[in-house]
């Protein structure tokens, strides 16, 4: 189970950076509709595009595992 909402995190980071999803898409060499589809995807976006989006926004990704 993912404990945070990565889709919302990407949207918030775009807002904080003053960038649109279209601008992020251009930064990573993909289309705006593709970025939008990935962000809204029901089963999450933890894939290469997710990593590229956060790196384009100036972030490293840290995954924390918590024992249940």
Question: Which ranges hold each PLM region?
Answer:
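A short, Lys/Arg-rich alpha-helix, primarily the initiator
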Residues: 1-17
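Residues within the alpha-helical elements of helix-turn-helix
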Residues: 16, 27, 56
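Helix-turn-helix DNA-binding elements, focusing on the entry/boundary residues of the two helices
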Residues: 10, 21, 32, 47-50
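Short amphipathic recognition helices of helix-turn-helix/homeodomain-type DNA-binding modules
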Residues: 65-68
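Short alpha-helical "recognition helix" segments of helix-turn-helix
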Residues: 23-25
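DNA major-groove recognition helix of helix-turn-helix/homeodomain DNA-binding modules
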Residues: 48-63
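Recognition helix of helix-turn-helix/homeodomain-like DNA-binding domains
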Residues: 29-44
């Amino acid at each position: 189970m993912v404990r945070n909402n990565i889709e919302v995190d990407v949207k918030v980071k775009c807002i904080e950076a003053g960038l649109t999803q279209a601008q992020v898409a251009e930064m990573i060499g993909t289309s705006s509709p593709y970025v939008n589809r990935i962000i809204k995807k029901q089963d999450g976006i933890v894939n290469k595009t997710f990593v590229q989006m956060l790196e384009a926004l100036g972030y490293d990704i840290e995954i924390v595992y918590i024992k249940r």
